[in-house]
Swiss-Prot record:
It comes from Claviceps purpurea (Ergot fungus). It catalyses: DNA(n) + a 2'-deoxyribonucleoside 5'-triphosphate = DNA(n+1) + diphosphate. SMART domains: POLBc (SM00486). Pfam families: DNA_pol_B_2. PANTHER family: DNA POLYMERASE (PTHR33568), DNA-DIRECTED DNA POLYMERASE (PTHR33568:SF3). InterPro entries: DNA-dir_DNA_pol_B, DNA-dir_DNA_pol_B_CS, DNA-dir_DNA_pol_B_mt/vir, DNA-dir_DNA_pol_B_mt_lin_plsmd, DNA/RNA_pol_sf, DNA_pol_palm_dom_sf, RNaseH-like_sf, RNaseH_sf. The keyword Transcription regulation does not apply. Its main location: mitochondrion. GO terms for molecular function: DNA binding; DNA-directed DNA polymerase activity; nucleotide binding. GO terms for cellular component: mitochondrion. GO terms for biological process: DNA replication. This DNA polymerase requires a protein as a primer. Keywords: DNA replication, DNA-binding, DNA-directed DNA polymerase, Mitochondrion, Nucleotidyltransferase, Plasmid, Transferase. This is Probable DNA polymerase.
Length: 1063
């Protein structure tokens, strides 16, 4: 066999040209260059330094902020590095495509941040859009002796090699190109690395140096190889520069062939001395020299055991790519490329492609040792409350403010002076809260995000413009937000030469009910009182006289008003007393809840910002088995986005709009006991995931378990749709034909009832059983058998708040309070979701942290320059470690299946459906006893026996039960202001006026206005099913057929599942 061999040329022309320019001015270097020839002492020093270089394993495709891991041969210890030490060097992709080594050096050392004789862990990443791919499966340990170090060229060539392989593995995602390359240099301080079995580790991990590789493997021959300019793509035969014809076998007496074999195996052994690898050449071996973009590769093809193998090596015998083609014996063959498998027919047409996807488990929540030492058997007593009162009118202002903690016998309160200076009022209160005695207190405001934060920020920012404030301003680091609502506000300022801070949380995010309802729920001794809000205007702040008229009060029963009437009513005194009660009652609620949660679950209530995060922490710390019943942690953006399309909410539909008053017939309103907890005890997707893309194969849905994009066709004459679909405004359950993402179990349920399903692509998982069983059983037991009303309410809250947390969006956004200069930078470099003018030259911006190429180009900014700018921050925001869209989507699917089974049972037993809302059903069929139970999870509880009812639209209905009670619901307006006759008018297509309460936040001027307005309710607004009209009367509904409807996908996602409701 004839073999073409490659002579590796050390004298790269780019490097030679650079070295000849000793001043470095030609390539933008601002330091003198040393002579090209090294002294013996310098060479010895380089050798010593190279021996100290560490190679670091880890890192594959995924997120772009992770900890570094240092491994020994037997164990590893994680070392967390401060990202402030990281040096980011962004480079144009064209530098590597054109093998422009000179530009590579110029960019690398242009700002003198990369130091010589210093060890770094180098991680190379490709950016395509807003997604990062790590190049290769390991970091590179680098230590540059000086500008002449040949190892620089090896790093450059290694990046080109890894680019080639990356583009092969992700051809669809990257399309053989990218936007930019990021070189992350993480300084490695050997004195801070603690590795067990260090001696063996150094031997194993020590990188081979450029010089060593060059001397051991110098391929023989001096051939003029043709330079080609094509995309970096190894797996294309038409790109081969030279093909070597196969003779009678590889093993011949040709000395060049024997020397190649010897040198190749020597280098292969050198590359992995522990594994002692040796390549076994056979009679079928064929060797190619492949030139790509001026980069030389060795390609060896073999046929072994009926399998065709193609391996691609670089010039130092490092394996870059291994393809295997094998026959399946049934007229098909499979190509294996790492974790990619492609099935072909004999015509070389793709039948199906699969790709194994590795998923990590959500980690079990564990207290670290420091936290365990600090934990007490008692609940955290350092709780405080803060509240403020505001005037009404066009521009409300804060006129009273106070706080309460367990450190004081009574609340500390402040009232506005006669100059009506709200700025000084708020400043005085916050300064008092910054006293040393309150340093460990975590304060809560009920509805902070929608109310209190607006006034607090405005007045403190106004204070920053005063002489005192300019010298010592307030700061507001990294507020925690949700949908532009501030959930956590930290206020910092220097007091007596020391930095003090006050942290305020939104208690409504943890206990999503009004304070008045919370006082009732938890049997509070000092319940919330009533106050004449409409009387709170500037001119009344120092009023004394008779009690204001009842019309100044909102929603106060007359009996309660009469208790408040007196002749010597003082506005200031009444305000402070009202404020006093609010502070104490909220504090009592928080203390009760905190103690109960600590008693039941050994969890600190104060460690969580929302009720869903609290439920998640309880589950992960007390009930989760991450070894045997692991939940997949979904951080990959493509996987998340696809499965999120299958994340549908509950069904809310009107089937029949009216129940006529009839004393001879009964109707029933049923609720399912804890629907979502019940649904969660089914099997959920595990860690083993395979992506399927079906081209010609027929796939049986009953053999799959996961999420799939399908063509759907429903049966004709369908009354009850079984599969959901999003429209621009809502979620419907249509008939007809369409395509969409669905959970396999919901597809199987639909197929069993006549649907036709054709799978196009999707993700198949293994099954995991009993993941939530213990959690549901134990918490549900507390709910059904509580020691007190507090435990019952907490158990109910925790049960209903867990699953939604797993469905949180991983596309994390960041909220910052920034001055106008930073605000302008964000607007021109990032995707800004929301911006709020706070006044005083400050803005609250909610944005995607990563710099966006399209935004930069819109504003005529150089993308690479922006990335390399020291004024920009590209760290990003890491997704949470407890997000699993697969779990959330599967549980909601099981819940819809359960509800559909009940509705199908009613229809099959000649019952009539009237209305359903997520976990409730209204029907005229009395369900059998085996389906009904007051407390058993998953069974139905009879809430009402109905004598009359009107069902106008989703969440808009009125029913009358056998006790004569009228239960009214009206979406978006005050149902208390509507009468039963109003619902009857809407049924008869009459427009009805209703009262809507609106809240408008004005951060710039620092106030919130809450007002009632009159709106008209459209009686024909229901569009989730087609209205059936007979003799001008609405008599029922039928499903919408998508072959008659041009519907579009929307961003409609499940709501009210996480427990994080807004007021």
């Amino acid at each position: 066999m004839l073999i073409l061999l490659l002579q590796y040329n050390v004298s790269n022309p780019c490097l030679t040209n650079l070295l000849e320019n000793k001043t470095g001015t030609g390539v933008g270097l601002n330091f003198p260059l040393k002579p090209a020839r090294l002294t013996l002492a310098q060479q010895r020093k380089r050798s010593e330094l190279k021996k100290a270089r560490l190679a670091l394993r880890g890192m594959g495709i995924g997120d772009f902020n992770r900890e570094l891991r240092f491994y020994s041969t037997s164990a590893y210890t994680k070392t967390h590095w401060n990202n402030k030490d990281r040096i980011n060097k962004w480079m144009q992709y064209d530098i590597f495509v054109d093998r422009d080594f000179e530009s590579f050096l110029s960019h690398l050392f242009s700002d003198n941040r990369i130091l010589f004789e210093y060890t770094y862990a180098l991680l190379v990443k490709v950016r395509k859009g807003n997604k990062f791919y790590t190049i290769g499966d390991r970091q590179i340990g680098v230590l540059f002796v000086d500008i002449h170090d040949p190892f620089l060229l090896e790093v450059f060539d290694t990046i080109i090699d890894r680019l080639a392989i990356l583009f092969e593995e992700y051809p669809t995602e990257l399309e053989y190109t990218c936007d930019a390359l990021l070189l992350e240099f993480h300084p490695v301080r050997p004195e801070k690395i603690k590795i067990s079995n260090l001696k063996d580790a150094k031997e194993k991990l020590a990188p081979k140096t450029f010089a060593t590789g060059m001397s051991v493997f110098n391929l023989i021959g001096g051939f003029d190889l043709r330079k080609v300019s094509t995309p970096i793509n190894l797996n294309k035969k038409r790109y081969y520069s030279t093909q070597v014809d196969r003779l009678n076998g590889f093993i011949t007496d040709n000395p060049r062939l024997l020397e190649f074999k010897q040198k190749f195996n020597e280098q292969l052994f050198m590359a992995s001395p522990k594994k002692k690898l040796k390549y076994e050449f056979c009679d079928t071996s064929v060797v190619f020299i492949l030139v790509k973009r001026g980069r030389e590769y060795i390609v060896i093809e073999d046929v072994k055991d009926g399998e065709f193998h193609k391996r691609i090596f670089n010039k130092t015998a490092s394996l870059l790519l291994h393809l295997i083609d094998k026959s399946n014996g049934d007229g098909t063959w499979t190509r294996i490329n790492g974790n990619f498998n492609t099935l072909y027919n004999l015509e070389n047409e793709i039948i199906m492609s699969t790709k194994a996807i590795g998923l990590r488990a959500i980690p079990k929540f564990l207290y670290n040792k420091k936290n365990e030492e600090e934990m007490s058997v008692l609940a955290n007593p350092n709780l405080g409350t803060i509240d403020l009162e505001t005037t009404t009118g066009a521009q409300p202002k804060c006129y009273a403010i106070g706080f309460y903690t367990n450190l004081d016998s009574k609340p500390i309160k402040f009232y506005i002076d006669k100059n009506l200076d709200s700025c000084q009022l708020v400043h005085t209160c916050i300064q008092e809260m910054m006293r040393y005695k309150y340093r460990n207190v975590l304060f809560y405001a009920h509805n902070l995000g929608k109310f209190d934060a607006v006034f607090l920020l405005k007045e403190l920012l106004r204070f920053n413009l005063t002489t005192e404030g300019l010298n010592n301003p307030y700061e507001f680091p990294a507020p925690l937000t949700r949908n532009s609502d501030i959930l956590k506000l930290t206020i910092k300022r220097t007091v007596d030469g020391k930095t003090r801070k006050v942290t305020i949380m939104d208690s409504f995010a943890l206990l999503p009910r009004s304070l008045r309802d919370l006082c009732k729920d938890y049997n509070i001794d000092n319940p919330k009182s009533y106050f004449p809000y409409l009387f709170s205007v500037d001119s009344h702040l120092f009023y004394t006289g008779a009690t204001p008229n009842i019309n100044y009060y909102l929603d106060i029963p007359k009996a309660e008003y009469l208790k408040l009437v007196k002749d010597d009513w003082d506005f200031k005194d009444e305000t402070l007393e009202y404020l006093n009660l609010d502070l104490i009652s909220l504090h009592q609620v928080l203390v009760k809840v905190n103690k109960a949660i600590n008693f039941l679950f050994d969890i600190e209530f104060t460690s969580c910002a929302t009720v869903s995060s609290l439920a998640n922490k309880i589950f992960l710390s007390k009930f989760y088995d991450d070894k045997n019943k692991a939940i997949p942690l979904v951080k990959d953006i493509d996987l998340f986005n696809d499965i999120h399309e299958a994340y549908y909410g509950g069904r809310v539909e009107v089937f029949n709009p009216i129940i006529m008053a009839d004393s001879t017939k009964s109707y029933y309103y049923y609720d399912v006991n804890s629907l979502y907890p019940f649904a969660s005890i089914n099997d959920i997707p595990g860690l083993k995931c395979t992506f399927y893309e079906v081209v010609k194969a027929n796939v049986n849905i009953h053999e799959l378990f996961g999420f799939f994009y399908c063509k759907i066709k429903s049966p004709d004459n369908l009354y009850l749709g079984l599969l959901p679909k999003r429209t621009e405004t809502s979620l419907i359950f249509p008939g007809g034909a369409w395509e969409g993402w669905y959970f396999s179990e919901e597809l199987k349920f639909a197929v069993a009832h006549g649907y036709e399903v054709e799978i196009i692509k999707g993700y198949n998982f293994d099954r995991v059983s009993n993941v939530f069983n213990e959690f549901v059983q134990e918490v549900y037991k507390v709910k059904c058998n509580p020691n007190n009303v507090t435990e019952k309410n907490i158990a109910k809250l925790i049960l209903n708040s867990l699953i939604g947390r797993f469905g949180m969006n991983i596309n994390k956004i960041k909220t910052s309070l920034v001055p106008s200069e930073k605000h302008n930078e964000l607007l021109t470099t990032r995707v800004v979701k929301s911006t709020t003018d706070l006044g005083s030259g400050m803005f609250m911006d909610i944005y995607v942290p990563g710099i966006d190429k399209n935004i930069c180009e819109d504003f005529n900014l150089d993308y690479i320059e922006v990335l390399n700018s020291t004024n920009t921050d590209e760290k990003g925001t890491m997704p949470d470690n407890n997000v699993s869209i697969t779990t959330a989507a599967a549980v909601l699917s099981y819940a819809r299946i359960h509800m559909a089974q009940i509705m199908l049972f009613i229809l099959e037993n000649n019952g009539t459906l009237y209305y359903t809302d997520t976990d409730s059903i209204v029907t005229d069929l009395k369900l059998p006893e085996e389906m009904v139970h007051q407390t058993e999870i998953g069974k139905l509880k009879l809430e009402h026996t109905i004598t009359q009812g009107y069902f106008i639209a989703d969440k808009t209905y009125a029913i009358v039960n056998t006790e004569g009670e009228i239960i009214k619901r009206a979406k978006g307006v005050k149902s208390s202001k509507l009468t039963l006759e109003d619902y009857e008018k809407m049924y008869n297509k009459e427009v009805v006026e209703a009262t809507k309460t609106s809240s408008k936040r004005n951060y710039k001027d620092g106030f919130v206005t809450i007002s009632d307005s009159t709106v008209k309710l459209n009686p024909t607004s229901y569009t989730k099913r087609s209205r059936v009209i007979s003799k001008d009367k609405w008599i029922g509904t039928e499903i919408i057929r998508l072959d008659k409807l041009n519907s579009k996908l929307s961003t409609h996602t499940p709501k009210s599942l996480s427990g994080d409701k807004t007021k």
